[in-house]
Regions:
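Conserved ABC transporter NBD signature motif
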Residues: 73-86
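Conserved ABC ATPase "signature" region
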Residues: 112, 119-138, 190
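A short, proline-enriched helix->beta-strand linker immediately N-terminal to the Walker B motif
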Residues: 161-165
Length: 265
């Protein structure tokens, strides 16, 4: 486990799936900053966990990367590959599936919006994506027939349907029970290894970050700044109860407590 104080962005010459330089975000008439001077580079195929106290700007940062909201200052780049510009897919804590569509048709809609016009091809691809998340037999199931974990699997398949370079995940497993969350951790890591996507995963769960991330980035309380980062060399697959994961969890928790105390939260 390598610990570094993350104060600057990586050189612009380094390969990047996401590059943020001096990013600041303010809301309201008084312009109080939520994020301040964020410098962060996510390498192609890297799994980065963003961690911090509630209200530190983690979700706001994801929205900026996704293009849902503009930064007040600084630059956000998704270089992409070759001549194709990069783009990101965003997965929320709630599945946000359309309840009047089946699991498969929810994915088909994403494929249609991507530009896949042929219905047969869309159905075939939707079936393939459901297979990736172990829901091969759930194409025709309605949303109300799916458990919370199954809904999040469908939401993940829908995100994958966008063929994005970067997968942004905003506390996607926070509402699930511990056993389901544990299973989905395993499945997410397998998918990440298979697809080689870049992943930016927001969580307030320190153990979750220690289990999943190749790198864990800690944001300070408002205004959110990068306070610390950990480069994690614990091999995957990891378990929550692994000694190395427990040690890392303790180290991150201690720093998180310092940040919370420092800012009076």
């Amino acid at each position: 486990m390598t610990v570094t104080a993350a104060l600057g962005a990586s050189p612009a010459t380094e390969p990047a799936a996401v590059r943020l330089t001096g990013v600041t975000k303010s809301f309201g008439k008084d312009g109080v900053p939520v994020l301040d001077g964020i410098n962060l580079t996510v390498a192609p195929g890297e799994f980065v966990c963003l961690l911090g106290a509630s209200g530190c700007g983690k979700s706001t940062l994801l929205n900026l990367i996704a293009g849902l909201d503009p930064a007040s200052s600084g630059s956000i780049e998704l270089p992409g590959t070759g001549s194709r510009p990069g783009h990101a897919a965003l997965m929320f804590q709630e599945s946000a599936l359309f309840p009047w569509l089946s699991a498969g048709r929810n994915i088909e809609l994403a494929l249609k919006l991507r530009g896949l016009r042929n219905r047969v091809e869309r159905r075939t691809e939707a079936q393939r994506l459901l297979g990736l998340v172990r829901l091969e037999t759930s194409y025709d199931k309605r949303v109300h027939e799916l458990s919370g974990g199954m809904r999040q699997r469908v939401a993940l398949a829908r995100a994958l349907a966008q063929q994005a370079d970067v997968l942004l995940m905003d506390e996607p497993f926070a509402a699930l029970d511990a056993i389901t969350r544990d299973v989905l951790h395993e499945e997410l890591i397998k998918l990440w290894q298979e697809t080689q996507l870049s992943v930016v995963f927001v969580t307030h769960n320190v153990r979750e970050a220690a289990r999943l991330g190749q790198r864990v980035v800690l944001l300070s309380s408002r205004p959110g700044r990068i306070a610390r980062e950990w480069r994690v060399d614990i091999p995957q697959p990891r378990r929550i109860e692994d000694a190395a994961v427990t040690e890392l969890t303790r180290a991150i928790t201690a720093e998180l407590h310092k940040e919370i105390s420092r800012h009076g939260n």
